[in-house]
């Protein structure tokens, strides 16, 4: 889910996770579908008097082996004595990583992640994206990390000007299509300016002005041909 700050990405994710009610419209999941949500402040709800490992065991889907949990914890920078730390002594970053891992190991049908990479280093971000590629369910997420988005996304939901646009394909495909649309819009604007005598006329614009406009139009047309 992409969009500028303030466009409503978090509101959208919190709505489809059931945390808040829709401002308008409605949505429905099929019967029996389970969701799991991770948000930037989700970790603040962790109050259990557990260790890192015991907390994860309580919240992970039944059937995950002990060694699998240890491997997952290691990939989230919990190793050695860290897994036996009391939750109450964890830092904010550690709490966020544990909360994220807890959401993932629930193995829900729909996993909803709001900025999951904020407390992860580059190697962990890449490892998380690669591991989620094999997730047996649907993942909705928003992230400012381009590497994570490029590795994981196969469909882009863009929120812009209170409207939602759907782009099939990965992040690179989205960027390509977005640039193409921007070029087409600029081409139409330049054509309008070039043809509208109220804006551009032989009497009111110098030769250099008209030359610049023609060059911009030619450049846009060449780029459009290249993209297409």
Report the location of each language-model feature.
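ABC ATP-binding cassette signature C-motif
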Residues: 1-228
């Amino acid at each position: 889910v992409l969009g500028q700050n303030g466009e409503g990405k978090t509101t959208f994710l919190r709505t489809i996770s059931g945390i808040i009610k829709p401002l308008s419209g409605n949505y429905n999941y099929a019967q029996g579908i389970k969701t799991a949500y991770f948000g930037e402040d989700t970790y603040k709800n962790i109050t259990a008097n557990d260790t890192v490992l015991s907390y994860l065991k309580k919240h992970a889907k039944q059937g995950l082996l002990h060694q699998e949990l240890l491997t997952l914890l290691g990939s989230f920078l919990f190793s050695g004595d860290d897994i036996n730390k009391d939750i109450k002594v964890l830092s904010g970053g550690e709490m966020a990583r544990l909360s994220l891992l807890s959401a993932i190991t629930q193995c829900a049908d729909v996993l909803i992640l709001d900025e999951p990479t904020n407390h992860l280093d580059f190697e962990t971000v890449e490892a998380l994206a690669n591991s989620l590629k094999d997730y047996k369910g649907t993942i909705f997420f928003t992230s400012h990390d381009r590497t994570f988005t490029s590795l994981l996304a196969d469909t882009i939901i863009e929120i812009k000007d209170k409207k939602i646009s759907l782009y099939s394909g990965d992040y690179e495909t989205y960027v390509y299509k977005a640039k193409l649309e921007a070029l087409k819009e600029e081409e139409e604007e330049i054509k309008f300016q070039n043809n509208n005598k109220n804006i551009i006329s032989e009497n009111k614009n110098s030769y250099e002005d008209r030359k610049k406009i023609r060059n911009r139009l030619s450049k846009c047309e060449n780029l459009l041909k290249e993209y297409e």
